[in-house]
Amino acid sequence: AGPSATTGVWFGPRL
C-alpha cells in the first residue's frame, strides 16, 4: 500500500 504511481496520492488505481 502506498501512493499511486500515476497520481501520487493514496486514492489511486494503484494502491
Swiss-Prot record:
The modification Leucine amide is found at L15. Keywords: Amidation, Neuropeptide, Secreted. This is CAPA-Pyrokinin. One of its GO terms (molecular function) is neuropeptide hormone activity. Disulfide bonds: none annotated. It comes from the Eukaryota. The lineage of its organism: Eukaryota, Metazoa, Ecdysozoa, Arthropoda, Hexapoda. GO terms for biological process: neuropeptide signaling pathway. Its main location: secreted. The keyword Ligase does not apply. The keyword Secreted applies. Mediates visceral muscle contractile activity (myotropic activity). Belongs to the pyrokinin family. GO terms for cellular component: extracellular region. InterPro entries: Pyrokinin_CS (IPR001484).
